[in-house]
């Protein structure tokens, strides 16, 4: 009692790969990495993708949840060294053509699926319980 638990998970869903890697994003990032994703899309013109993040806070028998999305496309090359995972190949639609890997952390946070999910969760926490 009196302890809160926050869980967050996210994935990259690429249209041209049947929404792969999706729930396997972490595994795919560790195994084939960014160049592997680029190679899989080499002959595929549909590079549209979406990052999705889900956040859940549980405390004293109550829970709040949220989902944040960031639509974009997969780059044809690795660009930038900031961030982690697929950041150097994901270009958000709401940006200026740079990958997340080319952005400062503050720029990425303003656009990212995780930032959106956590902002929505905070808004949900401020709302009265039903």
Predicted ranges, named:
Residues 1-130:
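Anionic-ligand binding patches
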């Amino acid at each position: 009692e009196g302890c809160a638990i926050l869980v967050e998970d996210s994935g990259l869903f690429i249209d041209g790969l049947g929404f792969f890697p999706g729930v396997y994003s972490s595994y795919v990032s560790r195994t084939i990495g960014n160049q592997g994703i680029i190679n899989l899309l080499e002959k595929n013109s549909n590079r549209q993708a979406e990052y999705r993040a889900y956040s859940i806070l549980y405390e004293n028998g109550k829970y709040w949840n949220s989902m944040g999305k960031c639509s974009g496309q997969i780059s044809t090359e690795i660009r930038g060294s900031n961030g982690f995972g697929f950041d150097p190949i994901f270009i958000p639609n709401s940006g200026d053509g740079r990958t997340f890997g080319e952005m400062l952390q503050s720029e990425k946070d303003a656009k990212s699926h995780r930032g959106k999910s956590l902002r929505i969760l905070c808004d949900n926490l401020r709302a009265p319980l039903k």
